[in-house]
């Protein structure tokens, strides 16, 4: 799907301030992303989500993340994620490839 090395660079620049990816990693401003793929929105244990995230009810996978990461607040109105999104599809695909490799 994407380039894992480029995706890691994007994660460090745009995501790591608020998220961790390793198993047992702590929640920061955003939840730890270990086990992200195949999990429903708003389900990371021990993280306090908005009702919007808890009730969205979609399963995270490559397709849902591709859409979400373009404009998080449009995809889940009411989310507390303050990230504006990534407009370039290739950059989102690289990030998703990295997340897939590092969160399971």
Swiss-Prot record:
Keyword annotations: Acetylation, Electron transport, Heme, Iron, Metal-binding, Mitochondrion, Respiratory chain, Transport
Biological role: Electron carrier protein. The oxidized form of the cytochrome c heme group can accept an electron from the heme group of the cytochrome c1 subunit of cytochrome reductase. Cytochrome c then transfers this electron to the cytochrome oxidase complex, the final protein carrier in the mitochondrial electron-transport chain.
Compartments where found: Mitochondrion intermembrane space
A Gene Ontology term for the protein's cellular component: mitochondrial intermembrane space
Highest taxon of the lineage: Eukaryota
Organism for this UniProt entry: Tetraodon nigroviridis
Name the UniProt record assigns to this protein: Cytochrome c
Family membership noted in the UniProt record: Belongs to the cytochrome c family.
Post-translational modification: Binds 1 heme c group covalently per subunit.
N-acetylglycine modified-residue sites: 2
GO molecular function annotation: electron transfer activity; heme binding; metal ion binding
Cross-referenced Pfam families: Cytochrom_C
Gene3D superfamilies: Cytochrome c-like domain (1.10.760.10)
Record-linked InterPro entries: Cyt_c-like_dom, Cyt_c-like_dom_sf, Cyt_c_1A/1B
Record gene name: cyc
Positions annotated to bind heme c: 15, 18-19, 81
